[in-house]
């Protein structure tokens, strides 16, 4: 009885639309054919700055390259791998990461991140990534990206602010 009474006084739940929204068209279909193919590679090399260390956020921690900055280099390498092959006006954005940070490197170390496109379907891309310093692999994994149109992407991002 209590349950029925509560159910009657509860506010109605908003109903979901009967039809799912239409899947957006791949950018390639909108802006011409893409030249993307497995095997495209990109890389970036940078010297580790103090601002990129975990110690820059908490001085009690070691002055070594932070995981987010290592991943950022991997993301840039992935974006550069396909930049010249994207449809005009398109960009790629990160959607998911699966990365292991294997070794620490100090300020002043040179880090090279490499990315290789291994899968693509429509606007979705998968890269194998690796970061190294000298002969040491310091991180490896997978980066997932999507091809988007910048104006629509930015408008959608702004629509989520309150």
Give short role names for the model-derived ranges.
Residues 45-49, 100, 142-144:
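Generic structural detector for well-ordered beta-strands
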Residues 30-66:
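Catalytic strand-loop segment that frames the active site of acyl-thioester-processing enzymes
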Residues 1-29:
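Polybasic, lysine-enriched low-complexity intrinsically disordered terminal tails
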Residues 72-76, 80:
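Short, residue-level hotspots on alpha-helical faces of the histone-fold
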